[in-house]
Regions:
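Amphipathic alpha-helical segments enriched in hydrophobic/aromatic and basic residues
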Residues: 12, 31, 40-41, 62, ...
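Short glycine/proline-centered loop/turn elements that form peptide/ligand docking sites
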Residues: 10, 29, 38-40, 62, ...
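N-terminal intrinsically disordered/low-complexity leader segments
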Residues: 1-18, 196-197
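Membrane-embedded alpha-helical bundles of multi-pass transporters/translocases
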Residues: 38-41, 52-54, 153, 162, ...
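Generic hydrophobic, amphipathic alpha-helix propensity
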Residues: 16-27, 44, 69-80
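Amphipathic C-terminal alpha-helical segment
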Residues: 107, 114, 144, 158-178, ...
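Amphipathic alpha-helical packing segments from all-alpha helical-bundle domains
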Residues: 75-82, 95-98, 102-110, 116-119, ...
Length: 197
């Protein structure tokens, strides 16, 4: 992560943790409604219901909030896939593929704009290493639980799925076809599972 965008403090008390979460939630809500350049720390503080001074105790600038939100999404996505893989270990791969495709679509459908902002700013915020690490976590869990999966093909599949859902989420609402995105995800996962040795 680039210097100057790390949070000022890591909250230890429950109230402080809640405030930090509220800041991230307010930021996500604002970014779902308007472009990044139209969201300021003042807007975020106001939406959170705190003073700008309080916000600056947690984050030095808007980029640090965006970076923390990005890391949170990466963590959530990695945990989601790890849990899905664990849930379907030894069970129907078809059911895993269906649930994974549907879950991804629902996540991006709900937070299309904010996830777009997050993904488009990974490199600028110096988060590419963290993004690759999160994807590797998913890849490792998948190859551990499903013997015979090629880790390189797992990487390509995860990248293809993420790109598919992200690209669909960034289209204007009248052009979004989530069933098409689901089908592409199913096909990519199906090809991966069919490639097992």
């Amino acid at each position: 992560m680039r210097s100057g965008i790390k949070p000022r403090k890591t909250p230890k008390q429950q109230r402080s943790q809640r405030t930090r979460e509220e800041i991230l939630e307010a930021t996500a809500h604002l970014l779902n409604d308007r472009p990044l350049d139209e969201v300021s720390t003042n807007h975020i503080a106001q939406k959170t219901g705190i003073s700008i001074g309080t916000l600056y105790k947690y984050y030095p600038n808007k980029d640090s909030i965006l970076a923390d939100l990005s890391l949170r999404y990466m963590q959530e996505d990695a945990e989601l896939f790890e849990n899905l893989f664990e849930k379907y270990k030894g069970r129907s791969l078809k059911d895993l593929i269906e649930e994974a495709a549907e879950t991804l679509v629902q996540i991006h459908r709900k937070n299309a704009r904010v996830r777009g902002v997050v993904y488009q700013n990974f490199e600028r915020l110096g988060l590419m290493t963290e993004a690759q690490s999160a994807r590797r976590r998913i890849q490792t869990k998948g190859t551990e639980l499903f013997s015979g999966l090629d880790s390189a093909l797992m990487w390509v599949t995860l990248t293809a799925i993420s790109s598919t859902v992200f690209a669909m989420s960034q289209l204007s609402p009248q052009h979004r076809n989530w069933e098409f995105a689901r089908n592409l995800c199913r096909q990519a996962l199906g090809l991966l599972m069919a490639s097992r040795a």
